[in-house]
């Protein structure tokens, strides 16, 4: 079972409308994964592959509507959905100063409600069609450099890079309407950089981050664009023993 989230039930008082009578999702799940982990002297390698199968009733589906010229999201239960997919992960590390890794996910979620809701005779036009407004192929990669005992024993300087890629996907049912004029959530590729200096074995930490340093157009959903290039700084003190 998956209970509805707070936003799904009550909305966010901005761009998400809640629905208080949402039912919990009921799913039968099968997951199969294989992993490999080995250390070759200073070199480390970890690989993992997984298969996913999920049969869901009362699937909580996100939709979009327009009120007064403003788009907003809403949620509703959809009778029957099946999800099949796989994920791949790979991580390489060298000694204690470098690691690089990434993941790739392909998740195919399709409508298996053969007849329209409330009807036992009229067949659905999108039976076995991929669910709309849902990313189905995405990946990420990250790399980190570490300088241990820099300046003072117990201090660590780290520089990190990470990126996220997401395939474009249709806002509405992909089998309806003209392919060339469909509303699409565009392909997205973001890049981030970070710099962190940890002192006194983790008691103090200073970090700086530049998110989306290529200033690419990114979207939370079809109606809400994320911020462009942004810079962040943080200072943390740990008061435990």
Residues covered by each model-derived region:
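Membrane-embedded beta-barrel scaffold of Gram-negative outer-membrane proteins
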Residues: 24-84
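Outer-membrane beta-barrel translocator domains and adjoining extracellular loop/strand segments
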Residues: 5-13, 59-67, 107, 111-121, ...
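Residues that define the transmembrane beta-barrel architecture of outer-membrane proteins
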Residues: 26-30, 53, 80-84, 133-139, ...
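Residue-level detector of the transmembrane beta-barrel scaffold of outer-membrane proteins
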Residues: 7-9, 31, 44-48, 89, ...
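Gram-negative outer-membrane beta-barrel transporters
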Residues: 47, 52-55, 76-170
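Extracellular loop and loop/strand-boundary signature of outer-membrane beta-barrel proteins
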Residues: 14-22, 71-77, 85-87, 123-131, ...
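C-terminal beta-signal and adjacent terminal beta-strands/loops
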Residues: 1-2, 57, 100, 164-190, ...
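Short coil turns and loop connectors of transmembrane beta-barrels in diderm outer membranes
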Residues: 28, 40-43, 57, 95-96, ...
């Amino acid at each position: 079972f998956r209970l509805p989230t707070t936003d799904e039930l009550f909305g966010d008082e901005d761009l998400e409308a809640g629905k208080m009578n949402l039912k919990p999702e009921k799913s039968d799940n099968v997951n199969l994964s294989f992993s490999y982990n080995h250390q070759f002297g200073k070199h480390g390698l970890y690989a993992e592959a997984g298969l996913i199968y999920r049969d869901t009733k009362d699937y909580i589906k996100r939709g979009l509507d327009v009120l007064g010229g403003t788009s907003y999201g809403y949620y509703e239960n959809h009778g029957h959905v099946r999800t099949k997919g796989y994920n791949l992960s790979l991580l390489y590390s060298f000694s204690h100063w470098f690691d690089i890794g990434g993941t790739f996910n392909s998740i195919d979620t399709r409508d298996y409600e053969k007849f329209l809701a409330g009807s036992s005779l009229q067949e659905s036009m999108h039976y076995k069609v991929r669910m709309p407004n849902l990313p189905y192929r995405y990946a990420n990669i990250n790399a980190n450099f570490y300088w241990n005992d820099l300046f003072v024993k117990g201090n660590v300087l780290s520089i990190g890079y990470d990126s996220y890629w997401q395939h474009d996907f249709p806002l509405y049912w992909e089998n309806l309407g003209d392919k060339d004029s469909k509303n699409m959530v565009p392909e997205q590729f973001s890049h981030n950089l970070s710099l962190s200096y940890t002192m006194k074995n983790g008691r103090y930490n200073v970090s700086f981050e530049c998110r989306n340093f290529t200033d690419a157009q990114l979207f939370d959903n079809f109606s809400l664009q994320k911020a462009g290039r942004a810079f962040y700084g943080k200072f943390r003190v740990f008061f435990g023993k």
